[in-house]
């Protein structure tokens, strides 16, 4: 636990010295008072996939307690196409574990993601966050295990073309400056996302890099660490919001579109998954892919058409899912293969202590690498 709190980038975790999963209303109030926070934002995804925001000025302590406890009502028909205007009122209730400081607000502002509730005070059955929660709970109830996930968030930065140090077309993977033009933008995005609670694995420039009609198109990626599947989804929502807002401040344009033009790399939203039990990764057994992992992969193969229906709702997805573009075109799986539907990436299964080999002064590490193995669904995007 101490290792998770030390050097934690989340500003509230750093102050409260507890993981975000343990945040209480009293913790939120304490932080607001100590840091002289003047506003609170409720944020929640709508049917268009964007985060919506409701602003509150903290009038006094009683009002703060009221909004944190009772939430607020909103017009569901303006958020979701499946809700009729004749009976559209919904409640939005903040989830304290998602609290973060808004890096873009001039006034000190604390934001939280919210859950939707219906008129009877019950979770809205068709809301995005509750649908995911039900699926996660059903998995745990049936298997006795926990489903964890993380996303690879790919996007293009679009800016005016420049002549200095031009990048090589479609050779932008892990490129450094000055050939990669937007490393500073990406690292600032990563800083803001981490301060908001995002568990980031790494960031880098991606393959896609081209010019078109006087504009530079540079592809980048921010990848996360495996976590509870509901938290993984929350982190992706906040990350997209951060990237768009920071791009606006920089005077840049951003797109998460699956495909911009033919022959150039598309942007996916690859999802890595692992199955946990009692804190142990169940994806490996004796250094090879476990029966549990193989059953999970088989399930993804069987449900490929349904997964595609939900994971590829943008028509341009189907210009991305073409041969020779590191995108799946067949229902199959394989080790280390970026053209299959489900990829089994390198998982540090070899017993070699590579750190000690690269650094002869280091003692044997005895690091448990079994936690690192995942499988990756490569079809989703958007």
Per-range role (PLM):
Residues 113, 152-166, 209-223, 257-279:
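Histidine-centered divalent-metal-coordination microenvironment in nucleic-acid enzymes
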Residues 204, 223, 237-262:
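Gly/Pro-rich turn-and-neighbor structural signature
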Residues 1-210, 227-241:
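ATP/Mg2+-dependent ligation/transfer catalytic cores
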Residues 101-109, 146-148, 212-216, 263-264, ...:
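Short glycine/proline-enriched loop/turn "hinge" motifs that connect secondary-structure elements
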Residues 47-52, 120-121, 157, 209-210, ...:
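Flexible loop/turn segments at secondary-structure boundaries
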């Amino acid at each position: 636990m101490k290792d998770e709190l030390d050097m934690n980038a989340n500003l509230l975790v750093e102050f409260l010295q507890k993981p975000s999963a343990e945040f209480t209303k009293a913790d939120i109030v304490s932080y607001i008072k100590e840091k002289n926070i003047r506003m609170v934002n409720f944020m929640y995804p709508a049917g268009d996939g964007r985060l919506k925001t409701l602003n509150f000025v903290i009038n006094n302590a009683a009002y703060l307690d009221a909004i944190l406890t009772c939430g607020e009502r909103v017009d569901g028909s303006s958020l979701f196409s499946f809700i009729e205007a004749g009976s559209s009122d919904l409640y939005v209730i903040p989830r304290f574990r998602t609290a973060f400081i808004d890096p873009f607000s001039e006034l000190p502002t604390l934001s939280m993601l919210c859950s939707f509730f219906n008129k009877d005070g019950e979770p809205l059955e068709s809301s995005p966050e509750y649908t995911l929660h039900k699926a996660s709970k059903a998995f745990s109830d049936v298997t006795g295990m926990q489903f964890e996930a993380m996303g690879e968030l790919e996007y293009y930065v679009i800016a005016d073309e420049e002549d200095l140090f031009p990048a090589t077309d479609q050779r932008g993977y892990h490129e450094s400056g000055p050939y990669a033009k937007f490393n500073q933008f990406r690292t600032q995005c990563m800083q803001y996302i981490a301060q908001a609670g995002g568990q980031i694995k790494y960031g880098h420039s991606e393959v896609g890099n081209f010019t078109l009609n006087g504009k530079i198109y540079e592809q980048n990626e921010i990848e996360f660490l495996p976590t509870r599947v509901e938290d993984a989804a929350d982190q992706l929502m906040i990350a997209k919001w951060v990237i768009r807002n920071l791009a606006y401040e920089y005077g840049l344009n951003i797109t998460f579109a699956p495909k911009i033009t033919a022959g150039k790399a598309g942007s996916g939203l690859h999802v890595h998954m692992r199955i946990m039990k009692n804190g142990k990764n169940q994806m490996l057994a004796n250094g090879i892919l476990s029966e549990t992992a193989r059953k999970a992969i088989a399930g993804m193969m069987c449900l490929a058409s349904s997964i595609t229906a939900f994971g590829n709702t943008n028509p341009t997805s189907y210009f991305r899912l073409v041969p020779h573009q590191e995108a799946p075109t067949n229902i199959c799986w394989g080790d280390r293969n970026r053209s299959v539907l489900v990829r089994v990436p390198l998982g540090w299964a070899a017993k070699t202590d590579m750190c000690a080999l690269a650094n002869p002064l280091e003692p044997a590490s005895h690091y448990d690498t079994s936690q690192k193995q995942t499988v990756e669904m490569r079809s989703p995007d958007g």
